[in-house]
Design a protein with these regions (language model features):
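A short glycine-rich, Lys/Arg-flanked "PGG" loop and its adjoining helix->strand segment in the class I
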Residues: 146-161
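N-terminal, positively charged/glycine-rich alpha-helical extensions of SAM-dependent methyltransferases
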Residues: 1-32, 182
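C-terminal alpha-helical "lid/dimerization" subdomain adjacent to the S-adenosyl-L-methionine
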Residues: 165-223, 229
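Core SAM-dependent methyltransferase catalytic element
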Residues: 223-226, 232-250
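A short acidic, Gly/Pro-enriched loop at the edge of an enzyme's catalytic core
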Residues: 121-132
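Hydrophobic beta-strand segment of the Class I
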Residues: 33, 133-134
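Class I SAM-dependent methyltransferase SAM/SAH-binding core
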Residues: 63-122
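Conserved alpha-helix/loop element of class I SAM-dependent methyltransferases that forms part
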Residues: 32-35, 42-61, 77
Length: 250
C-alpha cells in the first residue's frame, strides 16, 4: 500500500482510467481533514453518515461501494452497522487514502475493507455488482456529475440502494438565513485558519453552486436512478438522497 507522502500509488492500487493528481486539492488538506470536519460540523457529521448507511437497508453479507471514500469514515460506518459486509472504497486523493487505510487497520477491518485510487466517473465493475453504493460530500466535486450518477445506477443491484450525502446552502426554513451566514462566512474563514489552506473557500463556493434538492433529484432520474427519499438534515446544510436503479435501467 502507498505510504502517506509517496508521490505515486503502487500500480496494483490504481484503477484503469484514473488520472493521477485529480485529488490534488484534497491531498493538501488530508492531514487535518477529519479534525476540520468535526469542528465545522460541530460533530454532527457522524450522525449524517449513520443515517446514510441505515438508508441503504443492506442485506446480510452485503457488498458495498463507497465512492470518494476519502479517509474511510463511511466505509467504517458500514462495517460498524454491518460487520459481515465487504466494502470497496475509491478515491482520487492518495493522501486521503493513506489516512483511510491507517484507520481501517486500526479498526481491524483489513479483510473487510479495501481502499483504491479510483474515479467515480469510470467504474471498472460489472453491472449490478453492489448491494449498496454511497458517496458522502463527494458528488459536488466530481467534474462530470451525470456520468458518475449513471455509473452508480449501473453497478447497483436492482434491489440495492444508492445513498448520497451532500453539503449545500440552505434555501428554505426559519433558520435558513442563519445557516447560510454560517456557511458563507464562518466555514471558509475557520477552515482556512485551522488548516492554513485556502481550499475551504472553495467549499463555500461549491456548496452555493450545488443544485437545490429537487433539481438534483431530477438529475438522478435522468441518470437512471429512481429517487426514494430526499431528506434535508441540520437546517438544510446537508441533504440525504436515497435512490435505487430505475426500472428502465439495463
Amino acid at each position: 500500500m502507498s505510504a502517506l507522502g509517496e508521490d505515486r500509488p503502487h500500480p496494483d492500487e490504481v484503477l484503469p482510467g484514473t488520472a493521477f493528481g485529480s485529488g490534488a486539492m484534497f491531498d493538501r488538506i488530508a492531514a487535518r481533514y477529519d479534525t476540520l470536519n468535526r469542528i465545522l460540523s460541530l460533530g454532527v457529521d457522524r450522525r449524517w453518515r449513520r443515517l446514510a448507511v441505515r438508508a441503504l437497508a443492506l442485506p446480510p453479507a452485503a457488498r458495498v461501494l463507497d465512492l470518494v471514500t476519502g479517509t474511510a469514515d463511511v466505509a467504517l460506518e458500514v462495517l460498524r452497522q454491518h460487520p459481515d459486509a465487504r466494502v470497496l472504497g475509491l478515491d482520487p486523493s492518495l493522501q486521503m487514502l493513506a489516512i483511510g487505510r491507517r484507520k481501517v487497520r486500526r479498526a481491524g477491518h483489513e479483510r473487510s475493507a479495501e481502499l483504491l485510487f479510483g474515479d467515480a466517473q469510470d467504474l471498472p465493475y460489472a453491472d449490478r455488482s453492489f448491494d449498496g453504493v454511497t458517496i458522502a460530500f463527494g458528488i459536488r466535486n466530481v467534474p462530470d456529475r451525470a456520468r458518475a450518477l449513471a455509473e452508480m445506477a449501473r453497478v447497483t443491484k436492482r434491489e440495492g440502494r444508492v445513498a448520497i450525502l451532500e453539503l449545500m446552502e440552505p434555501r428554505e426554513g426559519f433558520l435558513a438565513p442563519l445557516a447560510r451566514s454560517f456557511v458563507r462566512s464562518l466555514v471558509p474563514r475557520v477552515g482556512a485558519l485551522l488548516s492554513g489552506a485556502p481550499e475551504y473557500r472553495y467549499l463555500q463556493r461549491s456548496m452555493a453552486a450545488f443544485p437545490a434538492p429537487d433539481a438534483f433529484a431530477e438529475a438522478m432520474r435522468r441518470a437512471g436512478l429512481e429517487p426514494l427519499e430526499t431528506r434535508p438534515l441540520t437546517q438544510g446544510v446537508v441533504c440525504l438522497f436515497v435512490a435505487r436503479p430505475g426500472r428502465g435501467a439495463a
